[in-house]
């Protein structure tokens, strides 16, 4: 079970991604001893979304260079979140779809038991639709993985 109801790593990632005022959510994240970062990405290509999130994770110290398990956990969390955003069909451009997303990454130890280790959550929130202005709709995705 989670340390405390307000310390759920996925919930915090979602709140951070959808928040118009992320400072409030970031304060809760800091009090939970988690790391977090936010960013934006827009593309018709899934690989560019993955690359943008990976770059933010490396730049903010979420994953260490040369530590395979950290990068692997991040990739799984990103792909799981993309499945939510794209309703299971991760292709974008080949289906004439584009996304404009805010993303949040949260890393930490959400469980009381130390042996449960660290986890990483990636939340994506924004719009998806045809590459025609005004033809998109809201979408959200969440991926959580252990490190």
Curated annotation (Swiss-Prot):
Coiled coil: none annotated. GO terms for biological process: L-histidine metabolic process; positive regulation of gene expression. Gene3D superfamilies: Hut operon regulatory protein HutP. Pfam families: HutP (PF09021). Signal peptide: none annotated. It comes from the Bacteria. The keyword Lyase does not apply. The keyword Transcription regulation applies. Keywords: Activator, Histidine metabolism, RNA-binding, Transcription, Transcription regulation. One of its GO terms (molecular function) is mRNA binding. InterPro entries: Regulatory_HutP, Regulatory_HutP_bacillales, Regulatory_HutP_sf. Homohexamer. Belongs to the HutP family. Antiterminator that binds to cis-acting regulatory sequences on the mRNA in the presence of histidine, thereby suppressing transcription termination and activating the hut operon for histidine utilization. This is Hut operon positive regulatory protein. It comes from Halalkalibacterium halodurans (strain ATCC BAA-125 / DSM 18197 / FERM 7344 / JCM 9153 / C-125).
């Amino acid at each position: 079970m989670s340390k405390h109801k307000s310390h759920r790593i996925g919930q915090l990632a979602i709140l951070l991604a959808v928040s118009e005022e992320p400072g409030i959510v970031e304060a809760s994240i800091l009090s939970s001893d988690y790391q977090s970062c936010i960013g934006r990405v827009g593309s018709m290509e899934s690989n560019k979304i993955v690359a943008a999130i990976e770059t933010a994770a490396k730049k903010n110290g979420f994953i260490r260079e040369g530590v395979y398990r950290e990068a692997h956990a991040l990739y799984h969390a990103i792909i799981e979140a993309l499945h939510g955003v794209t309703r299971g069909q991760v292709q974008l451009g080949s289906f004439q779809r584009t996304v404009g997303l805010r993303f949040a990454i949260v890393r930490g130890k959400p469980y009381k038991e130390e042996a449960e280790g660290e986890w990483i959550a990636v939340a994506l929130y924004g719009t998806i639709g045809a590459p025609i202005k005004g033809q998109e709709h809201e979408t959200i995705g969440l991926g959580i993985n252990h490190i």
